[in-house]
């Protein structure tokens, strides 16, 4: 019985040791295949940043473009320098609309092109031209031509009618265009002004009316029935200047 107990204890200790050894062994980690895109004119520094430089084909000199945090920023800096130096013959990292096909290393569109596309999408040229034309039309002055005197009168578009629109002309300013004039107004008599009536056939000439034909003097009221048949006798034998025939 004791022999069996020792065997069981030894087997348990061995199993525990083997289990511990398995746990201590490092497990193989899956290999991560990260392929970085190789851009033209870009180099990675040991501390993790990216440097960009370009070589001038005519002078055989290298120009330092700077150090950037990402490879895309360094590649964009190289493209800008290459396009300015070499023009359409430059080898770029991104695709540009004005460059020939196959001139880029990658098939990615340049960030500069995407920004320009977005700006044109939200602000199309037709809309910008329409907006500018509306602003110019609102700021301009409008003109209206008078058909009679053919004088252009400039006015601001404020909704008020002008002289040319109403067609009104003063008599004094445009007397040569009128066939006839209105008669003059009579003078005002509010403040005691003397009213003179023109001497025409349609009015009575009071000045030439003779009062002598109606002149007579009456000393009193005389009844016609009390007159005698004789036209030469006076009333009650009193002298009078009134006679009848």
Curated annotation (Swiss-Prot):
Residues 1-12 have a biased composition (Polar residues). It is found in: Nucleus. Gene3D superfamilies: AP2/ERF domain. SMART domains: AP2. GO terms for cellular component: nucleus. Belongs to the AP2/ERF transcription factor family. ERF subfamily. Probably acts as a transcriptional activator. Binds to the GCC-box pathogenesis-related promoter element. May be involved in the regulation of gene expression by stress factors and by components of stress signal transduction pathways. This is Ethylene-responsive transcription factor ERF087. It comes from Arabidopsis thaliana.
């Amino acid at each position: 019985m004791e022999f069996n107990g020792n065997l069981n204890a030894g087997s348990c200790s061995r199993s525990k040791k083997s289990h511990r050894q398995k746990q201590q062994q490092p497990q193989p980690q899956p290999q991560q295949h990260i392929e970085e895109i190789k851009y033209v004119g870009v180099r990675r520094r040991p501390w993790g940043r990216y440097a960009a430089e370009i070589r001038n084909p005519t002078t055989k000199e290298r120009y330092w473009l700077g150090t950037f945090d990402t490879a895309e920023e360094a590649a964009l800096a190289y493209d800008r320098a290459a396009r300015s130096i070499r023009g359409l013959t430059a080898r770029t990292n991104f695709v540009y609309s004005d460059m020939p096909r196959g001139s880029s290393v990658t098939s990615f569109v340049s960030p500069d092109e995407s920004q320009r596309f977005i700006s044109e999408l939200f602000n199309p040229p037709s809309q910008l031209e329409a907006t500018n034309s509306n602003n110019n039309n609102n700021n301009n002055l409008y003109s209206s031509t008078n058909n009679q005197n053919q004088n252009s009168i400039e006015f601001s578009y404020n909704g008020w009618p002008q002289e040319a629109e109403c067609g009104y002309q003063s008599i004094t300013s445009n007397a040569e265009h009128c066939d006839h004039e209105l008669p003059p107004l009579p003078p005002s008599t509010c403040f005691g002004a003397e009213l003179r009536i023109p001497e025409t056939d349609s009015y009575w000439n009071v000045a030439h009316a003779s009062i002598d034909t109606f002149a007579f003097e009456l000393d009193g009221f005389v009844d016609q029935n009390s007159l005698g048949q004789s036209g030469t006798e006076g009333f009650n034998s009193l002298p009078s200047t009134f006679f009848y025939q």
